[in-house]
């Protein structure tokens, strides 16, 4: 509880005077006070030194006090690296992967050759062509379509446009009938001559 009050006192909060009196008398609270200030200065990057001057001496003492366990060395012959290379398994493994390695190297060389030629050709073609846009921003019909409820629609026909359209269709039908009659008359004449 005293450490919480000590932390609050460091943050600038009001604490009881009993805590201040205890801080002046108790060495453990003074050590906590010191460690809290050290932590605060390190967190605020106010101090680069956060280890005490006697840190190395403490570590040396702790290392000396540590129990040393002795392990009996069991003499087991370990294979030498030369033996591992000469084992039957390694020889079979090398024999299995050697052709695959050769094929992989050949495929890599071919890939580099093809990509190199293509990139070389693309650079030459790109220099001869006019600049084309990377991103086509207009629709295929090259017209911007308005998107609004009140926008006039280009698809609805007026009465004048409908009348012109029906006249055009009528003229096309008359032309078709005339050509059909002329063609049928020409067929009748040629068929009568053949008889």
Curated annotation (Swiss-Prot):
Provide Cytoplasmic-side residue ranges: 1-94
One CC-aspect GO term? plasma membrane
Site (Cleavage) residue list? 148-149
Subcellular location per UniProt equals: Cell inner membrane
Query: Which residue ranges does the entry give as Periplasmic-facing topology?
Result: 118-195
User: Which ranges of the sequence are coiled-coil?
Assistant: 160-181
What domain of life does the native source organism fall in?
A: Bacteria
Extract the InterPro entries matched here: Anti-sigma-E_RseA-like, Anti-sigma_E_RseA_C, Anti-sigma_E_RseA_N, Anti-sigma_E_RseA_N_sf, RseA
User: Its biological function?
Assistant: An anti-sigma factor for extracytoplasmic function (ECF) sigma factor sigma-E (RpoE). ECF sigma factors are held in an inactive form by an anti-sigma factor until released by regulated intramembrane proteolysis (RIP). RIP occurs when an extracytoplasmic signal triggers a concerted proteolytic cascade to transmit information and elicit cellular responses.
Share the domain note from the entry. The N-terminal cytosolic domain interacts with sigma-E. After degradation by RseP binds to SspB, targeting RseA for degradation by the ClpX-ClpP protease.
Q: What is this protein called?
A: Anti-sigma-E factor RseA
Q: Which organism is it from?
A: Haemophilus influenzae (strain ATCC 51907 / DSM 11121 / KW20 / Rd)
Which gene is transcribed and translated to give this protein?
rseA
């Amino acid at each position: 509880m005293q450490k919480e009050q000590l932390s609050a006192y460091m943050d600038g909060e009001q604490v009881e005077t009993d805590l201040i009196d205890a801080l002046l008398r108790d060495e453990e609270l003074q050590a906590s006070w010191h460690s809290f200030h050290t932590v605060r200065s390190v967190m605020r990057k106010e101090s680069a030194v956060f280890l005490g001057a006697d840190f190395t001496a403490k570590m040396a003492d702790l290392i000396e006090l540590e129990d040393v366990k002795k392990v009996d060395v069991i003499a087991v012959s370990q294979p030498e690296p030369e033996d591992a290379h000469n084992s039957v398994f390694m020889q079979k493994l090398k024999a299995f992967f050697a052709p695959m390695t050769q094929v992989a190297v050949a495929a890599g060389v071919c890939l580099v050759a093809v990509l190199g030629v293509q990139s070389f050709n693309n650079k030459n073609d790109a220099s001869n062509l006019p600049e084309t846009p990377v991103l086509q921003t207009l629709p295929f019909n090259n017209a911007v379509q308005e998107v609004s409820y009140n926008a006039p629609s280009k698809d609805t026909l007026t009465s004048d446009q409908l009348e012109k359209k029906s006249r055009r269709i009528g003229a096309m039908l008359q032309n078709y009938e005339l050509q059909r009659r002329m063609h049928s008359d020409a067929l009748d004449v040629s068929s009568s001559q053949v008889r």
